[in-house]
Amino acid sequence: MRHTFQSFWIGDRISPYEALCMRSFIDHGHGFALYCYNSRLKVPRGVELRDASTILPKDQCFAYSTGFGAGSFSACSNLFRYLLLQRFGGWWVDTDVLCLTHCIPIYYSFFAREDDDFINGAVLYFEPGDRLIEECLRDALNLGRNVVWGQIGPRLITQKVQELNRGWEAQPASTCYPVHWSAALDLVDPRKTAEVASSTANSMMLHLWNEIFRQAAISKKCLPPRGSYLRMLADRHPVAGWRGLYLLNDGSDVCMPSALTKVRLPARDRVKCIAGTLLSNRLRPLRTSTAGDRHIMQVSNN
């Protein structure tokens, strides 16, 4: 069945990762409405832009100031979804959620576990005025801006689900969180593709865990390595804006390990190193052959 999914964006541009996620919903026949403060924001064809200020004035947006996630607008996004769902109801998805199927059932409410401990809020469905959302909104407003990562997100939703004895409604992690956040980099590791494909075989959606990618300094402007699960989806739902491709120095595609270390290079390059692979927001292709995507990359000082 066709559904319309709602989300929220702060900023003047989206990366190819967000575009890929939105495009996946459109390609599966669903609607996608993005609330933002820029009416000229470039988004994939078929995405409907809506005025976010009708839900939350821009001057009330805020980011985490300290700790894990510092600089992220995730807390503001949590508040926004509670305001939106309390008022209008419907589907909510974060901008780092991929749609994997056109076949999504009708729910009277939807929330799913990310693991045995927490309910995640990246994918939600509620009718307007649902008590669970009203209580999340009330507590989020009372806590204000001085919150830490997850405090008004998964932790708050989990707390309210328990207090209202609604744990029986929680869907299994396999519906939307088949890849746990601790294994997020498996999505861009060609060695893990079969394992990820098996985990997602019966999933409706896939959460990409954007903050894990951000903490690992994975550029969202570079195509994932060829052969990885995320690259397979990027090829299936093509979008514009990719500025590079992750490759090994010998020209072969990179297998992403779990460890990330910095390379001491000029500050203007901001280059990271993963197992001998130079990665950067400033990578650009020097040459592209007609066979596949064998780009040779260099650091651009422009």
Task: Show the residue positions of the predicted features.
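Short aromatic-hydrophobic micro-motifs that form the base-stacking/packing surface
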Residues: W91-V93
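Small-residue hinge/turn detector
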Residues: N78-G89
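Glycosyltransferase-associated regions of secretory-pathway enzymes
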Residues: M1-S77, T95-N302
